[in-house]
């Protein structure tokens, strides 16, 4: 990969500028802060030593949590996840793939827990729908064939580079 001769320059090559906020790091957080500053009319500069989303953002799993996995034991985290899930689906739907999440119950598990799981999700504002195990096998052919229960939740997949790039573009 060739480097642009203009990409790396001495600090002395730049004219002094004034800004309200300096953001260090062009990942999801830095780009999101830059977008938020721009929407609020706050002047900012985003500094990144490489390309956007090349650090931790570019290496994440891309799962857009519904919060369901926290609903039973950590309602506060579950509520925060579904709130942010809905915000991202609203402002960056072009970056979200509607994959859904599937929680299964195996013969050694309690179907009573599945009921508790659904109730906890509902209490946290997360849609959780019990489905027939036969449908779960169609939805996910690699699922354990011995399952006795299944619940669908609004998990998704997000493209971290596309989200970061969109936020940077929105900030300019």
Please place each PLM-identified region on the residue numbering.
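Conserved hydrophobic helix-helix packing surfaces used for dimerization/oligomerization
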Residues: 21-23, 44, 102
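Anion (oxyanion) recognition and catalysis
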Residues: 38, 122, 172
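Glycine-rich Rossmann-fold phosphate-binding loop(s) that bind the pyrophosphate
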Residues: 25-27, 49
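Extreme N-terminal leader/targeting segments of oxidoreductases
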Residues: 1-21, 36-40
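N-terminal Rossmann-fold NAD(P) dinucleotide-binding loop
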Residues: 30-31
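Dinucleotide-binding Rossmann-like beta1-alpha1 core, especially the glycine-rich loop
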Residues: 61-139
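Glycine-rich FAD pyrophosphate-binding loop
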Residues: 38-58
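Helical element adjacent to the flavin cofactor pocket in flavoenzyme catalytic cores
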Residues: 151-172
């Amino acid at each position: 990969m060739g480097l642009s001769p203009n990409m790396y320059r001495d600090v002395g090559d730049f004219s002094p500028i004034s800004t309200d906020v300096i953001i260090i790091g062009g990942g999801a957080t830095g780009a999101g802060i830059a977008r938020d500053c721009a929407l609020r009319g706050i002047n900012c500069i985003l500094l990144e030593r490489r390309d956007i989303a090349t650090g931790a953002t570019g290496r994440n799993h891309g799962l857009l949590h519904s919060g369901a996995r926290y609903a039973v034991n950590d309602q506060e985290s579950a509520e925060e996840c579904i709130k942010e899930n809905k915000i991202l689906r609203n402002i960056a739907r072009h970056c979200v793939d509607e994959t859904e999440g599937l929680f299964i119950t195996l013969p050694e598990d309690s179907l009573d827990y599945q009921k508790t799981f659904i109730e906890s999700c509902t209490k946290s504002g997360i849609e959780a729908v019990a489905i027939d195990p036969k449908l779960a096998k169609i939805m996910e052919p690699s699922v354990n064939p011995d399952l006795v229960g299944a619940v669908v939740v609004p998990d998704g997949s997000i493209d971290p580079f596309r989200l970061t790039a969109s936020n940077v573009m929105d900030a300019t």
